Swiss-Prot record:
SMART domains (alphabetical): AAA, NIL
Membrane-protein topology: Peripheral membrane protein
Identification of the protein by name: Methionine import ATP-binding protein MetN 2
Keyword Glycosyltransferase: no
Protein's organism: Shouchella clausii (strain KSM-K16) (Alkalihalobacillus clausii)
Length: 341
């Protein structure tokens, strides 16, 4: 559905040259929700705007539905953009128009026949849950309701792709959840492909199928959301995930325990089974759970536990090997009183 290849965007001023997007490549499959995470200045917005060519890449290609947008003329690009909706952090509603009027305006601007507009507006109002607000003005709406109007306008031309530029960052946590639930519903019911950018890993955890981390214009890590949460590689990815799922124990706390310290990761249904207790009993190893929980990512359980193991060294090694055989990952943080380098 979306394929970016070696995208680079350079901003030039009289005094300097700034690389906003640095040789980025990624793919988003049809019907996927793809989240791009990064701090301010990481290049997220620049990259998102390259997808529909609001920002024209300095080099590289971007294909949407098989079309290389970088090679289209002005008229062809305008037509292609009709199938790419976009919502923003700020709502950009017309204050003098009602909710109905704001959505109708988007349809009129797209060239939809006047006699077809009312029915389409009603359809969109129903879709985003604002049928009872059709005659309200923006000043009478909450932030979440304003964003729903923005989503309705973005869907006016029945796009196959929706780009979300920090769409929930101005909303409170409860409203954010409701907007994310709406986006998930649109993805499932309409088969809508969604690319969203955010600095909140919780947003990605809530609704995304795949994700990427951006830093200094580069995409430093990407993959299935579940896999990235289970085994983050880049330090920045670990930092972001730590904001949502914290499994870090301070060194001064660990120093109070003399046994082998291990982190055990269970994926899928294995996370819900009593493998650890069964194993410890089988190998006569004593276990002390220091920290842990089972998180649900995309409906799939991910269990991460940090524990102290005490017993004969050979028995501990055998227990760890057995746990690994039972579809778990084990990282020995410290072997007895000797810290691993």
């Amino acid at each position: 559905m979306i394929e970016a290849s070696e995208l680079t965007k350079v901003y030039k001023t009289k005094k300097k040259r700034v690389i906003g997007v640095d040789n980025v490549s990624f793919k988003v499959g049809k019907g996927e929700i793809f989240g791009i995470v990064g701090y301010s200045g990481a290049g997220k917005s620049s990259l998102l705007r390259c997808i529909n060519l609001l920002e024209r890449p300095t080099s590289g290609t971007i294909r949407v539905d098989g079309l290389d947008l970088t090679k289209l003329g002005t008229r062809e690009l305008r037509q292609a953009r009709l199938k790419i909706g976009m919502i923003f952090q700020h709502f950009y509603l017309i204050n003098q128009k009602t909710v109905f009027g704001n959505i109708a305006f988007a349809l009129k601007a797209a060239g939809v026949r006047a006699d077809l507009i009312p029915a389409r507006v009603e359809e969109l109002l129903e879709l985003v849950g604002l049928s009872n607000k059709r005659n309200a003005y923006p000043a009478q709406l909450s932030g979440g309701q304003k964003q729903r109007v923005g989503i309705a306008r973005a869907l006016a031309n029945k796009p196959s792709v929706l780009l979300c530029d920090e769409a929930t960052s101005a909303l409170d946590p409860t409203t954010t959840k409701s907007i994310l639930a709406l986006l998930k519903k649109l993805n499932e019911e309409l088969g809508l492909t969604i690319v969203l950018i955010t600095h909140e890993m919780a947003v990605v955890k809530e609704i995304c199928h795949k994700m990427a981390i951006m830093q200094d214009g580069k995409m430093i890590e990407q993959g299935d959301v579940y896999d990235v949460f289970a085994a983050p590689k880049a330090p920045l990815t670990q930092e972001f995930i730590g904001d949502v799922v914290s499994f870090h124990i301070p060194e001064h706390t660990l120093s109070q325990f003399s046994g082998t310290i291990a982190k055990v990761i269970f994926k899928g249904s294995v996370a819900q089974q009593g493998i650890i207790s069964d194993t410890l009993q089988q190998f006569s190893v004593k276990g002390n759970f220091l920290h842990g929980a089972i998180e649900y990512i995309g409906g799939r359980p991910l269990g991460i536990f940090i524990m102290e193991l005490k017993g004969e060294p050979t028995a501990i090694q055998e227990a760890i090997a057995y746990i690994k055989q039972r579809s778990a990952e084990v990282e020995v943080i410290r072997d007895g009183l000797r810290a691993f380098s």
